[in-house]
Amino acid sequence: MTTIVSVRRNGHVVIAGDGQATLGNTVMKGNVKKVRRLYNDKVIAGFAGGTADAFTLFELFERKLEMHQGHLVKAAVELAKDWRTDRMLRKLEALLAVADETASLIITGNGDVVQPENDLIAIGSGGPYAQAAARALLENTELSAREIAEKALDIAGDICIYTNHFHTIEELSYKA
């Protein structure tokens, strides 16, 4: 699978992901970019799950952002509704982590839109390791959001066999 982590701190929000794509227990590619900017660079998003499925969801989510003039929560809820009710979309297997200057959300294929505690998101096979590392760093250091995300991904990559050390990182700054 993969690891995606999002951290928000001191006027910065980061989403970072590794680059490993696997087919069963075989590494197919090591430099997949699972994190990208959407909606005129005002939203960042990362995915865990099937690559083709995730790119389809990115496109649909960007359309929802355009329909709702960039309102992240409304777009996320509308995508989740469609994902849950559309027969074809229901077959897509992926999780999305999305963020803008006001919110960080997880969108699932079950129709869930979750705003996590402490604006910390970690999804994918290495998610629990990245979440534990990021939480410890948030609570016990003054590292930046970007540094925390990078270190959390490094730790997850050391432990999870489906996570590598090729990182894609996107960051938004806002007035805290």
From Swiss-Prot:
GO terms for cellular component: cytoplasm; cytosol; HslUV protease complex; proteasome core complex. Allosterically activated by HslU binding. The lineage of its organism: Bacteria, Pseudomonadati, Pseudomonadota, Gammaproteobacteria, Enterobacterales. GO terms for molecular function: ATP binding; identical protein binding; magnesium ion binding; protein domain specific binding; threonine-type endopeptidase activity. Induction: By heat shock. This is ATP-dependent protease subunit HslV. CDD domains: protease_HslV (cd01913). InterPro entries: ATP-dep_Prtase_HsIV_su, Ntn_hydrolases_N, Proteasome_sua/b, Proteasome_suB-type. Changing S125A: Almost no protease activity. Changing S104A: 50% reduced protease activity. Protease subunit of a proteasome-like degradation complex believed to be a general protein degrading machinery. The complex has been shown to be involved in the specific degradation of heat shock induced transcription factors such as RpoH and SulA. In addition, small hydrophobic peptides are also hydrolyzed by HslV. HslV has weak protease activity even in the absence of HslU, but this activity is induced more than 100-fold in the presence of HslU. HslU recognizes protein substrates and unfolds these before guiding them to HslV for hydrolysis. HslV is not believed to degrade folded proteins. Signal peptide: none annotated. The keyword Cytoplasm applies. A double ring-shaped homohexamer of HslV is capped on each side by a ring-shaped HslU homohexamer. The assembly of the HslU/HslV complex is dependent on binding of ATP. It comes from Escherichia coli (strain K12). It is found in: Cytoplasm.
